[in-house]
């Protein structure tokens, strides 16, 4: 009996030594529970600050460029400028500064729900006409246009995300938390839609798109 136990120990000893050597020199890296969120950066490589103002600029120059600005929507009866546009070139006026207001926390991360607000002096009447939202479907353009008149913390029409572009810079997404059926463009796994550009009365208007999202950068003011 003792002889059998001795032989068994001799057989198991190399396996134990190999296992110890393998795990110490070649540790098994198990995947983490969730990826570490990345902070959104401005054109200087600084982390975006909810208390700072930024211009949303294009990643392209010349006729392909152009900053985002607040303008009057065609045929609108709103008492204040209520459209989110992009200049037709980066040569000319600068865009309207915005600030980003995260749903929670004091930092701005990629793929995080937030509100976007034009950060400009305004009269009391126009206070709500600085907060971005997505309007109803425009039958002529067959899309949903970005406009102002939103509400901070409003779940259905005023929440956006900043995500890394597959090309360069960042993309903006519109992400309603509820009533997804009201957004036929919100087709990804998170019920978000890409923000791009359409032409409205000769102007570049920000709108929801299926392809060619707008690649942007954030320049601190």
Swiss-Prot record:
* Highest taxon above the source species: Eukaryota
Q: What are the annotated disulfide bridges? A: 80-126, 175-186
Q: Which SMART domains match?
A: STI
Query: Which residue positions carry a glycan here?
Result: 51
| Keyword Disulfide bond (UniProt) | yes
Please state which protein family the record places this protein in.
Belongs to the protease inhibitor I3 (leguminous Kunitz-type inhibitor) family.
What's this protein's name?
Aspartic protease inhibitor 7
UniProt source species: Solanum tuberosum (Potato)
